[in-house]
Amino acid sequence: MKALSKSRFKQGLECPNKLYFSNNKEVYHNVKNNDPFLQALASGGFQVEEYARLQYPGGVLIEDPQDRKIYDYQDLADQTSELLKQENVVIYEAAFYVDDLFIRTDVLVKKGTHIQLIEVKAKSLDPSEPYNFVGKSKKIVSSWKPYLF
């Protein structure tokens, strides 16, 4: 089974066939997997994720033990389920099974019966552009609104 990541979710929105075939590397081979630039971008994404965790301190990280040879999806979902029994909790990398899909969210904040899911994205910008965040009208540029909370 392959997890439904943000990248795969976006891929499915662009083209459901790509999502379907992404499980079969012989049929659909991603030539960008070994691209050093894309690997550096992914590393930047991890940094942004760590920064987001600082915004929600005291959380519990759901992770698979490093000594396992395979990823135990059910164990990760069970850890999340156990933590959600608490009245209030912050969970990093919360894991769920929904209709045979394995899903993770960057940050989950539970306060009583209210649950907030926070997904973090990294976005590059051109530092020479004078209106990256705020436009000439002194308002936030609309293309940045999905990235700000």
Language-model features: where?
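Generic alpha-helix structural propensity
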Residues: L4, S43, Q47-Y51, D75, ...
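Charged, glycine-rich intrinsically disordered N-terminal tails and low-complexity linkers that flank
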Residues: M1-V60
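Mg2+/Mn2+-dependent nuclease catalytic core
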Residues: K85-F149
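General "foldedness" signal
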Residues: N23-E26, N33, Q66, D106, ...
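Context-gated lysine
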Residues: K2, K6, K10, K18, ...
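A general structural signal for short secondary-structure junctions and capping/turn motifs
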Residues: M1-K2, K10-G12, S81-L83, Y97-D99, ...
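Sequence-level detector for tyrosine residue identity
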Residues: Y20, Y28, Y51, Y56, ...
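A short acidic/basic microdomain associated with nuclease active sites
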Residues: V60-Y97
